[in-house]
A protein has these predicted regions:
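Acidic catalytic cores of enzymes that act on phosphate-bearing nucleotides/polynucleotides
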Residues: 146-193, 201
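Generic N-terminal targeting/processing segments that precede catalytic cores or assembly contacts
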Residues: 1-36, 64-68
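A conserved active-site cap/scaffold subdomain adjacent to cofactor or substrate pockets
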Residues: 181-253
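Internal alpha/beta core interface subdomains
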Residues: 27, 31-156, 160, 167
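Single conserved hydrophobic/aromatic residue that forms the stacking wall/gate
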Residues: 290-300
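Internal helical hairpin/lid segments
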Residues: 274-288
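Short acidic, glycine/serine/threonine-rich loops at helix termini
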Residues: 58-63, 90-92, 178-182, 187-189, ...
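Short active-site loop/helix that positions an aromatic residue
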Residues: 261-270
């Protein structure tokens, strides 16, 4: 979930930019899992921005606690602490990888943060308070493992661009989950559109070449939120099974529906796409009739 897919290709360098929020436990597990499968993962072919913010245990506890309180009105978050981590980033109290290089500074920052977080955990969510010493020790252990990967990635990327090297920016999630242009509030906590590749890496947008969008030949969604073309019948269930449509993080079944050309047109406009890669067309071969939702407004 954290490491770019390019790590599977020999001779390629993968970079996780400053715009990502990273769970140190998960990324350590990912690196170990890749190594176990025979892939070489070192600081030479994987680089992590020192400015990337860390998802910490209290972020996940708060994330899950909020969903429980909301009950049937829950957004359907993965519970990985992504939203609360971005909140701390915006409120200027987040912890970044660069903070791990000085244990004293890290502890001072966490001391201030935990004053607030522990009150929220105990008074609002009835959870145990987090020990600062335990948290600091755990983070320092992770830092020891990850230290070789943590660098100034914006400098590395810009030097690579200026040297004429080719770079593929790989985004995550869909346009309709964008914090501004998606189906708010049923969205993720960050920008998912193509222009975020610049602010999320530090590479000037004018240096970019073409913008390529990727879409399935049908629509899917995990969790709650509007889905006008959803197939709420046996055909939709069959499409889910045939297309193996289950959430990559939680394993939750994805809701399936017909391709929504209105949403697709919106995505093309917002991202300024030059071309689209259409995937899973073969999955639709199981159906005798295929529907699409097309724009009907005069402006379309």
């Amino acid at each position: 979930h954290h490491i770019p897919s390019g790590v599977l290709r020999n001779g390629k360098i993968s970079v996780i930019g400053n715009g990502a929020v990273i769970d140190p436990d998960i990324i350590v597990d990912e690196i170990k899992a890749l190594r176990k499968k025979g892939y070489k993962v070192t600081g030479k072919n994987l680089k992590i921005s020192e400015l990337a913010h860390l998802i910490l245990p209290f972020h996940k506890l708060i994330d899950i606690g909020r969903e429980i309180i909301k009950g049937k009105n829950a957004i359907g978050t993965t519970g990985r602490g992504i939203g609360p981590c971005y909140e701390d980033k915006i409120s200027r109290q987040g912890i970044r990888f660069v903070d791990l290089s000085n244990k004293k500074i890290l502890k001072d920052k966490l001391k201030m943060t935990l004053k607030e977080k522990n009150k929220i955990l105990s008074l609002v969510f009835n959870q145990k308070k987090i020990s600062i010493n335990t948290l600091v020790d755990d983070l320092m252990k992770r830092f020891k493992f990850l230290k070789e990967f943590i660098v100034n990635t914006e400098d590395f990327l810009n030097k690579s661009v200026n040297q004429g090297k080719s770079i593929l920016f790989e985004g995550a999630q869909g346009v309709m989950l964008d914090i501004d242009f998606g189906t708010y509030p049923f969205v993720t906590s960050s920008s998912t559109i193509s222009s975020n590749a610049s602010s999320g890496t530090g590479v000037p947008y004018k240096k970019f070449g073409k913008s390529i969008g990727i879409s399935k030949a049908y629509a899917t969604r995990v969790g709650h939120g509007p889905f006008p073309t959803e197939m709420i019948d046996d055909e939709g269930l069959a499409l889910r099974e045939f297309g193996d449509e289950y959430g990559a993080t939680t394993g939750r079944p994805r809701r399936c529906g017909w391709l929504d050309l209105i949403a697709l047109k919106h995505s093309v406009e917002i991202c300024g796409l030059d071309e689209i890669i259409l995937t899973k067309v073969d999955i639709l071969s199981m159906l005798s009739l295929i529907h699409i939702s097309e724009p009907t407004r005069p402006s379309s």
